[in-house]
Design a protein with these regions (language model features):
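Positively charged n-region of N-terminal signal peptides that target proteins for export
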Residues: 1-4
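N-terminal signal peptide c-region/cleavage motif recognized by signal peptidases
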Residues: 14-15
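Cys-dependent protein tyrosine phosphatase-like superfamily
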Residues: 18-117, 128-177
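Short cysteine clusters
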Residues: 120
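Substrate/cofactor-recognition hotspot
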Residues: 123
Length: 177
Protein backbone atom coordinates (compact mmCIF):
# COMPACT_ATOMS: atom_id res chain seq x y z
CA UNK A 1 0.00 0.00 0.00
CA UNK A 2 2.77 2.44 0.94
CA UNK A 3 4.68 1.57 -2.22
CA UNK A 4 1.58 2.20 -4.36
CA UNK A 5 0.97 5.53 -2.62
CA UNK A 6 4.59 6.59 -3.20
CA UNK A 7 4.32 5.62 -6.87
CA UNK A 8 1.16 7.70 -7.26
CA UNK A 9 2.79 10.69 -5.53
CA UNK A 10 5.85 10.37 -7.75
CA UNK A 11 3.71 10.26 -10.89
CA UNK A 12 1.71 13.28 -9.76
CA UNK A 13 4.90 15.23 -9.08
CA UNK A 14 6.24 14.72 -12.61
CA UNK A 15 2.96 15.15 -14.49
CA UNK A 16 3.19 18.97 -14.74
CA UNK A 17 6.59 18.71 -16.41
CA UNK A 18 5.29 16.01 -18.75
CA UNK A 19 2.36 18.28 -19.65
CA UNK A 20 4.79 21.11 -20.36
CA UNK A 21 6.77 18.94 -22.79
CA UNK A 22 3.67 17.79 -24.65
CA UNK A 23 2.27 21.36 -24.81
CA UNK A 24 5.48 22.62 -26.43
CA UNK A 25 5.21 20.09 -29.26
CA UNK A 26 1.44 19.97 -29.62
CA UNK A 27 -0.27 21.49 -32.65
CA UNK A 28 -1.65 24.97 -32.01
CA UNK A 29 -4.86 24.53 -34.05
CA UNK A 30 -3.97 27.51 -36.24
CA UNK A 31 -5.30 27.99 -39.77
CA UNK A 32 -3.41 25.75 -42.23
CA UNK A 33 -0.73 24.98 -39.62
CA UNK A 34 2.42 23.15 -40.73
CA UNK A 35 5.11 22.10 -38.25
CA UNK A 36 8.23 21.86 -40.41
CA UNK A 37 10.49 21.18 -37.43
CA UNK A 38 10.46 21.64 -33.63
CA UNK A 39 11.61 25.25 -34.17
CA UNK A 40 9.62 26.21 -37.27
CA UNK A 41 5.85 26.26 -37.62
CA UNK A 42 3.95 28.15 -40.31
CA UNK A 43 0.28 29.12 -40.25
CA UNK A 44 -2.39 31.50 -41.38
CA UNK A 45 -3.35 34.56 -39.33
CA UNK A 46 -3.63 33.79 -35.60
CA UNK A 47 -6.35 35.48 -33.55
CA UNK A 48 -5.51 37.73 -30.62
CA UNK A 49 -6.21 34.86 -28.21
CA UNK A 50 -4.05 32.44 -30.18
CA UNK A 51 -0.95 34.61 -29.69
CA UNK A 52 -1.07 33.76 -25.97
CA UNK A 53 -1.32 30.06 -26.85
CA UNK A 54 1.67 30.45 -29.18
CA UNK A 55 3.73 31.90 -26.31
CA UNK A 56 2.51 29.20 -23.90
CA UNK A 57 3.61 26.56 -26.43
CA UNK A 58 7.20 27.76 -26.08
CA UNK A 59 7.51 29.95 -29.15
CA UNK A 60 9.81 32.94 -28.73
CA UNK A 61 9.24 34.73 -32.02
CA UNK A 62 6.54 35.49 -34.59
CA UNK A 63 7.40 36.48 -38.17
CA UNK A 64 4.53 38.11 -40.06
CA UNK A 65 4.87 37.95 -43.87
CA UNK A 66 1.70 39.72 -45.04
CA UNK A 67 0.71 43.38 -45.05
CA UNK A 68 -1.05 44.87 -42.04
CA UNK A 69 -4.02 46.00 -44.12
CA UNK A 70 -5.21 42.55 -45.24
CA UNK A 71 -8.83 41.83 -44.29
CA UNK A 72 -7.99 39.27 -41.60
CA UNK A 73 -5.11 41.19 -40.02
CA UNK A 74 -5.18 41.55 -36.26
CA UNK A 75 -5.06 45.22 -35.31
CA UNK A 76 -1.95 46.02 -33.24
CA UNK A 77 -0.54 42.53 -33.80
CA UNK A 78 2.92 43.75 -32.89
CA UNK A 79 1.73 44.98 -29.48
CA UNK A 80 -0.29 41.82 -28.86
CA UNK A 81 2.65 39.57 -29.69
CA UNK A 82 5.04 41.62 -27.54
CA UNK A 83 2.61 41.64 -24.59
CA UNK A 84 2.49 37.82 -24.85
CA UNK A 85 6.29 37.79 -24.54
CA UNK A 86 7.00 37.11 -28.21
CA UNK A 87 9.57 38.84 -30.38
CA UNK A 88 7.69 40.28 -33.37
CA UNK A 89 9.25 40.60 -36.83
CA UNK A 90 7.33 42.02 -39.80
CA UNK A 91 8.54 41.26 -43.33
CA UNK A 92 5.77 42.39 -45.70
CA UNK A 93 5.86 40.14 -48.79
CA UNK A 94 3.78 41.19 -51.80
CA UNK A 95 1.46 38.33 -52.74
CA UNK A 96 1.92 38.88 -56.47
CA UNK A 97 5.64 39.71 -56.39
CA UNK A 98 7.67 37.85 -53.74
CA UNK A 99 11.41 38.51 -54.01
CA UNK A 100 14.51 36.61 -53.07
CA UNK A 101 15.45 39.68 -50.98
CA UNK A 102 12.28 39.02 -48.96
CA UNK A 103 13.39 35.43 -48.44
CA UNK A 104 16.97 36.44 -47.58
CA UNK A 105 15.65 38.82 -44.90
CA UNK A 106 13.49 36.00 -43.55
CA UNK A 107 16.41 33.55 -43.57
CA UNK A 108 18.65 36.02 -41.72
CA UNK A 109 16.04 36.29 -38.95
CA UNK A 110 15.55 32.51 -38.88
CA UNK A 111 19.24 31.76 -38.38
CA UNK A 112 18.75 32.46 -34.69
CA UNK A 113 17.54 29.28 -33.05
CA UNK A 114 14.40 30.53 -31.33
CA UNK A 115 11.22 28.54 -31.75
CA UNK A 116 9.40 30.57 -34.39
CA UNK A 117 5.88 30.85 -35.75
CA UNK A 118 5.85 32.26 -39.28
CA UNK A 119 2.46 33.41 -40.52
CA UNK A 120 0.68 35.37 -43.21
CA UNK A 121 -3.00 35.56 -44.07
CA UNK A 122 -3.69 31.88 -44.89
CA UNK A 123 -0.19 30.27 -44.75
CA UNK A 124 0.58 30.39 -48.47
CA UNK A 125 3.51 32.85 -48.29
CA UNK A 126 4.68 31.46 -44.96
CA UNK A 127 4.55 27.82 -46.11
CA UNK A 128 6.72 28.62 -49.15
CA UNK A 129 9.26 30.46 -46.98
CA UNK A 130 9.22 27.51 -44.56
CA UNK A 131 9.75 25.09 -47.45
CA UNK A 132 12.69 27.10 -48.80
CA UNK A 133 14.31 27.52 -45.39
CA UNK A 134 14.08 23.79 -44.70
CA UNK A 135 15.59 22.87 -48.07
CA UNK A 136 18.27 25.58 -48.32
CA UNK A 137 19.45 25.98 -44.73
CA UNK A 138 18.50 22.78 -42.93
CA UNK A 139 19.17 20.27 -45.70
CA UNK A 140 15.69 18.76 -45.64
CA UNK A 141 15.05 16.77 -48.83
CA UNK A 142 12.90 18.89 -51.15
CA UNK A 143 10.38 16.08 -51.60
CA UNK A 144 9.83 15.86 -47.83
CA UNK A 145 9.38 19.62 -47.39
CA UNK A 146 7.21 19.78 -50.52
CA UNK A 147 4.87 17.11 -49.11
CA UNK A 148 4.24 19.33 -46.08
CA UNK A 149 3.73 22.44 -48.22
CA UNK A 150 1.25 20.77 -50.56
CA UNK A 151 -0.95 19.69 -47.64
CA UNK A 152 -1.99 23.36 -47.62
CA UNK A 153 -1.85 24.45 -51.27
CA UNK A 154 -0.22 23.94 -54.67
CA UNK A 155 1.80 27.09 -55.42
CA UNK A 156 0.62 29.05 -58.45
CA UNK A 157 2.97 30.10 -61.27
CA UNK A 158 4.12 33.26 -59.46
CA UNK A 159 5.15 31.28 -56.41
CA UNK A 160 6.65 28.38 -58.42
CA UNK A 161 8.79 30.93 -60.27
CA UNK A 162 9.81 32.42 -56.93
CA UNK A 163 10.71 28.97 -55.54
CA UNK A 164 12.86 28.17 -58.59
CA UNK A 165 14.56 31.57 -58.36
CA UNK A 166 15.27 31.33 -54.62
CA UNK A 167 16.69 27.81 -54.96
CA UNK A 168 18.79 28.77 -58.01
CA UNK A 169 20.21 31.79 -56.20
CA UNK A 170 21.53 29.38 -53.57
CA UNK A 171 22.88 26.97 -56.20
CA UNK A 172 20.13 24.39 -55.80
CA UNK A 173 18.37 22.99 -58.84
CA UNK A 174 14.60 22.92 -58.58
CA UNK A 175 13.69 19.25 -58.12
CA UNK A 176 10.42 19.64 -60.02
CA UNK A 177 8.41 18.22 -57.16
Amino acid sequence: MTKALLTILLLLSIMPSMAEVSRENAPLSLLNEIQYSPNLTTAGQPSEEQFRAVAEAGFQRVIFLAFTDHKNAVKNEDRIARSAGLEFVHIPVAWDAPTTDDFDTFAAVMRATEKTLVHCEVNFRASVFGFLYQVIYLGTPAEEAWALLTRIWIPNETWKTFIVSALAEKGIEYPGV
